[in-house]
Amino acid sequence: MRKLRITICCILAFSIVEAQNGFSIIGVDKEVNPYQYTVQKRGEFKQAAVSSAHPLASMVGAVVMKKGGNAFDAAIATQLVLAVVYPNAGNIGGGGFLLGRKVNGDLIGIDYREAAPEKANRDMYLDKNGNPQMNLSLAGHLASGIPGTVAGLFATMPYAKLSFENLIQPAIDIASKGYVLTEKEAGSLNSVRESITKNSTQPTALVRATKWKVGDTLVQKELAATLTLIQKEGARGFYDGKTAELIVAEMQRGGGIISLADLKNYTAKLRNPISFNYRGHEIISFAPPSSGGILIAQMMKMVEKYPMSKYGFQSTKSVQLMIEAERRAYADRAEFMGDPDFFKVPVKTLMSDAYLTQRMSDYNPDKAGVSATVKAGIIKESEETTHLSIVDPAGNMVSVTTTLNNSYGNRTVVGGAGFMLNNEMDDFSVKPGVPNMYGAIGGEANSIQPGKRMLSSMTPTLVLKDKKPYITIGTPGGTTIPTSVYQALINVIDFNM
């Protein structure tokens, strides 16, 4: 088997061993020690690898595969641990997208993006004069969409091999036993303590009387209890019963609008992934309500006919060409992309060779364009996010991007449940033409409607070369996610990096 080259932080690889003694893997004398660990930023491995934003999450994912799990098992366990050790983006109170490819070639797309509550309306963040009140969609209870992560984890289970009870146990153990904070983690928690205190109505383990410092142990008993309830009752342990009641009680204390019915009615959805070819590579990414797949397809296909490798890495010609493709793709994003269950997204047209040739027809290599003058094409009728990449020994590939939107979401911890809520409502077009927190401008396609999923920039992506696993990639970064993935793929494929 060819070696797996991975350059995203926090990786671990291994030889496969048989499962022994269940999943008691957390402790000073166990496979994963939450009180002493190191970060590994890059490496080459023969068997398999897990890449995530935190070493403990990656280590757990690796041990899961050692004990007989596949890439999907590892993805579930890794996400759950991130919900404990990476509270600024790992979550059970947010949402995301999972893109997978089974060894037999089957593609899997699981959409567990947050959705607007039933009481949401398109003008909910406007004042009486029709002006946006952006603070309402950024922090506090009204900023939250219906969480989708837990539903997404259970939607992944049909592709896994191990029991959910085992896969969630490491996260429960780390939450209840605690983990040691690094200097960066302590500083991150301290930087948001005032905001969390302001927006949460109950005490939380993330905020204490004195500031956090390196070497402190963060124990989250309430979060452990919430995870244990999910372990015992499945998705119902989150969307119905005690946890759901705690979420709604928190909403009511802070003026939020998520209801018990919103939670009970939420479902993850299967989506057909987007696939296209670029210089002999098959690239697979996510479809709407993620804009990422269409965007990287547009941008890469717009530059494909140009000799990028001849231009050279970071040359004036290559940089200008890539930027002009980005301008055109993002103009289309604002006009044509939204939740496909509410708005007909012209996916085939947006990715067609004829349309993209027309989009680049006014490209002038001797003159830079101006973003303000770039409009959407004409189509005829007919710190804040986290990513994990996993490849297992059999060749299954999983790419997952999940988020609370802003770092630490809406800065509200659910009282009695111990987890942070998202502020994904800001990803809707609060008002057509008005940018969100990342500067993205949207139109009617992404307006607020009850039950609708807000347009996302998350871009979990897989690449095959000679029909074999080659790259699994994704990144945080808001609306810069698609351009980051696009540039990274160009760097690897065109510039042999």
Identify what each model region corresponds to.
Residues G27-V28, K305-L404, V413-A417, P432-G433, ...:
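Internal maturation/activation junctions in enzymes
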Residues M1-S24:
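Bacterial Sec-dependent N-terminal signal peptides
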Residues I284-G293, S389, T401-T412, T475-P482:
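Glycine-rich phosphate/pyrophosphate-binding beta-alpha loops
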Residues K46-A48, G95-F97, R271-P273, I296, ...:
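Short glycine-rich loop/turn motifs
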Residues V84-G109, I257-S259, M397-K467, I471, ...:
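Active-site rim segments in enzyme catalytic domains, especially the processed small/beta chain
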Residues Y266-T267, I378-E383, R453-M454:
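Short loop/turn motifs at secondary-structure junctions and domain boundaries
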Residues G293-S309, V463-I471, G478-M497:
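M16/insulysin-pitrilysin zinc metalloprotease superfamily fold
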Residues N21-M59, V63, A71-F72, I76-G234, ...:
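Noncatalytic scaffold domains of N-terminal-nucleophile
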